[in-house]
Amino acid sequence: MSIGVVVFPGSNCDRDVRWAAQGCLNIPTRFLWHETRDLNGLDAVVLPGGFSYGDYLRCGAIARFAPVLESLVEFVARGGRVLGICNGFQVLTELGLLPGALTRNRSLHFICEDALLTVESNRTPWLMGHQRKDSLTLPIAHGEGRYQCSDETLCQLQDDDAIALRYVNNPNGSVADIAGITNKTGNVLGLMPHPERACDPVIGGVDGRGLLQSLLG
């Protein structure tokens, strides 16, 4: 079992993900610079939070053209598991691996707080260790985390059982309280909360461990 963590210019949560996976759970982890195309030997890839390429045009809009993501599309097509956290979720929507878009929070302010979540679906292998309606508390930290999509896309997400996580108190105005979604096959999960920041009781909680522990079967 081995995880790759993509590093874009402007990423700032890549080391947090590596620490959570390798430091807390002993899962071998290596960094993937945005220019690489080599995903050989990896069982899963994580797109971390941060501000890829400065997010100058739109969150994730430049990162979607990175060479590593060309290989990632092929990796997903082969059934490889991908986790997009915060900015990583934004990148996945820009890349077209997940539907919808992440826009400015309804308050127009950056939000940094713990969010109470409900597991809506455990169909994705990333949430196989949880039961539906489990409660999780995970940190959020974003200015553009408001999930939006068309009515048609929302119906499709519901039909595919692809809404993975919902906010209990919806801090950013996301449609249908959505905090995380999967692709149709379930091997790709994008979420705005930060599970890597909730893997050690010393810093306030372990509710994020389950997503990474799922890699261990």
UniProtKB/Swiss-Prot annotation:
Key words, A-Z: ATP-binding, Cytoplasm, Glutamine amidotransferase, Hydrolase, Ligase, Nucleotide-binding, Purine biosynthesis
Domain Glutamine amidotransferase type-1: 2-217
Pfam families the record matches: GATase_5
CDD domains from the UniProt entry: GATase1_FGAR_AT
UniProt-listed Enzyme Commission number(s): 6.3.5.3, 3.5.1.2
Keyword Nucleotide-binding: yes
One of the GO biological process terms: 'de novo' IMP biosynthetic process
Gene3D superfamilies linked to this entry: 3.40.50.880
Function of the molecule: Part of the phosphoribosylformylglycinamidine synthase complex involved in the purines biosynthetic pathway. Catalyzes the ATP-dependent conversion of formylglycinamide ribonucleotide (FGAR) and glutamine to yield formylglycinamidine ribonucleotide (FGAM) and glutamate. The FGAM synthase complex is composed of three subunits. PurQ produces an ammonia molecule by converting glutamine to glutamate. PurL transfers the ammonia molecule to FGAR to form FGAM in an ATP-dependent manner.
Protein name per the record: Phosphoribosylformylglycinamidine synthase subunit PurQ
Organism: Prochlorococcus marinus (strain MIT 9313)
Upper classification of the organism: Bacteria, Bacillati, Cyanobacteriota, Cyanophyceae, Synechococcales
The gene coding this protein: purQ
